[in-house]
């Protein structure tokens, strides 16, 4: 007989800095209310995201009936990748009036290829349009 499927009791979505998960808020309270071993998650997450230190990495945690969990890390948010590529701290307060930086077509393609698994796009060109739209809404102009 195949093993029984575990019953899912919760799905938690968080955005945590890579390699810097600790039991303090927002991680502790979010996991604590589902009865998950917080330190176990923190150690596993930090080990899984060690290579991406400094970036914010979204994570989707599935909690099961027996209080065990699995998690899937996603790619960093497009806005964070755009800020990093443009070399700026934050986007424009008035995106359609004040432009704060420029991105080349190659930079947009690079971000689109990185985000491809998490985007609802069929090809890289469609993904590039999504990334370019995000950049424009942040006051970053896209060349090409």
UniProtKB/Swiss-Prot annotation:
The keyword Ribonucleoprotein applies. The keyword Ribosomal protein applies. Pfam families: Ribosomal_L11, Ribosomal_L11_N. Keywords: Methylation, Ribonucleoprotein, Ribosomal protein, RNA-binding, rRNA-binding. GO terms for cellular component: cytosolic large ribosomal subunit. It comes from the Bacteria. GO terms for molecular function: large ribosomal subunit rRNA binding; structural constituent of ribosome. Belongs to the universal ribosomal protein uL11 family. This is Large ribosomal subunit protein uL11. It comes from Streptomyces lavendulae.
